[in-house]
């Protein structure tokens, strides 16, 4: 899980929840390097995060995921899957993850979704049975043709997929932020007034864009940020102040949420 926070003068604001956030492996390496050479950085680092603690915790997490999905026996082979993995900006992290997991006794491969095959025995990569897929794809529902083999393997329970479409829909679909910023919905969950206030203070107001409210959002567009409900990163996301009518006509057709604009914090370098 990853939480995208913008730090403001009034505290952090939750912009997105991600189920396939990257960077943990690389950040652990960076933190370890900094503690070795730069003592001044130590107070700024998260307590207890070092290679000695991070590595076994991560390996244990994969093992726990394996057993949480009712698998018997030992987890043996893990596939790290993404589109054209060697071309991804975070490919170095895939290599770091592979090395870490191999050191804990797992066989690990890095593959694209089109490299996978499905057989009665399970999901295969070059004839090797895959037990668990560490899913780095941004095709969250596995709807694209390239992802169909992985989708079928997941739906037929022939592989453990983490994260998977169910987990993304449950936690990371941006429409969930509409609920988390709705005081009536929060009250219906049985939260106290204090708990409700904490959440409302932390989550910028978010709403689904549809034809009924499109005109109002257009008139107030400078106060909002628009992004696909099932998108990722900055892809097809727009700051309202910079919207053109052509782009707005596409947003107004649906599939987008509007979030109260919260600028990211900046730092002088």
Protein language model regions, located:
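Conserved metal-phosphate-binding beta-hairpin within the catalytic cores
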Residues: 1-21
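Domain-scale recognition of functional cores that engage charged ligands
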Residues: 6-8, 23-27, 34-269
């Amino acid at each position: 899980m990853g939480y995208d926070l913008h730090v403001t003068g009034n505290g952090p604001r939750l912009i997105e929840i991600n189920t396939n956030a990257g960077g943990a492996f690389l950040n652990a390496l960076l933190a370890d390097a900094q503690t070795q050479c730069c003592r001044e950085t130590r107070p700024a680092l998260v307590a207890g995060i070092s290679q000695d603690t991070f590595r076994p915790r991560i390996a244990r997490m994969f093992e726990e995921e394996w057993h949480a999905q009712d698998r018997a026996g030992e987890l043996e082979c893990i596939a790290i899957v993404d589109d054209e993995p060697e071309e991804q900006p975070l490919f170095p992290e895939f290599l770091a993850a592979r090395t870490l997991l191999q050191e804990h006794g797992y066989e690990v491969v890095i593959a694209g979704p089109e490299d996978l095959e499905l057989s009665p025995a399970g999901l295969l990569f070059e004839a090797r049975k895959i037990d668990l897929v560490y899913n780095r794809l941004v095709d969250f529902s596995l709807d694209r043709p390239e992802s169909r083999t992985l989708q079928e393997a997941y739906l037929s329970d022939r592989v453990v997929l983490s994260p998977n479409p169910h987990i993304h829909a449950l936690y990371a679909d941006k429409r969930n932020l509409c609920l988390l910023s709705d005081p009536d919905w929060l009250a219906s969950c049985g939260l106290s007034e204090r708990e409700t206030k904490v959440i409302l203070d932390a989550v910028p107001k978010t709403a689904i864009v549809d034809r009924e409210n499109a005109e109002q959002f257009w008139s107030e567009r400078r106060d909002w940020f628009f992004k696909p409900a099932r998108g990722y990163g900055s892809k097809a996301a727009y700051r309202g102040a910079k919207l053109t009518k052509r782009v707005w006509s596409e947003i107004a057709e649906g599939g987008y949420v509007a979030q109260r604009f919260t600028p990211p914090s900046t730092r002088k370098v």
